[in-house]
Amino acid sequence: MEGIRIIMNSECRSWAAGDPIMEKYHDEEWCKINHDDRFEFEMLCLEGASVGLSWKTILHKRAAYCMAFHYFDIDKCAAMKDEELNGLMEDTGLIRNRSKIYSVRTNAQAVQRIQQEYGSFDKYLWSFTDGKQIDGRWKSLSEVPTVSDVSKALSKDMKKRGMKFVGPVITYSFLQSIGIVNDHLVDCEFR
C-alpha cells in the first residue's frame, strides 16, 4: 500500500516495541550521530534524570523537561537561580529529585567551561573516540554492553570537571543517545 511503511520488529527494536514514544526514539534518535551541543546537553540531562529509573519514564516526561529547562539552552540552564530550580520541585512533570534538578545547572556550567576549552561540547565528547563512531555490530541484544572503556574514561573526566549523574553506565547510555556509540543490531533497519 502506498504511503504505509512496514517496520520489521527485529530483536533490536524489542525494547521499544509497543510504545510510540520509545519506538520513535529508537528509530529516529538512538545511536544516530548528532553534533549539536544543545542536543548533546539535553541527552546528558535526560540520561542523568534516568538514574534509578526507566528510560521510558524519562522519555515520557521529555516535553516537561524541555519546558522546565529552557529547551536545554546551555547558557540559560547555567544561569538558573536557586529560586527557579526550587520551583521545579513542584512540577509534577519532572522527577522531583533536588539533586537531579540542580545537576542541570551544575552540568551546564561545566559544559560552558568545556566549550571554552575545546570550542564545543561536541568536540570534547568526540575526542574520546578520535572522532570515530564506535559501531558494535552486535547480533543479539544480549551482546550489547552497558559500559565500555570509553564510557569509563569519559565518566571519570566529566566527574573531574564537576559534573553530576555521569557514572560509567549512564555515560554509556549517553554515548548511545548521541550516536558516538551505535548499538543497533546488525539486522536492524534503523542502523
Language model regions located:
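HhH-family (HhH-GPD) DNA N-glycosylase catalytic core used in base-excision repair
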Residues: 2-191
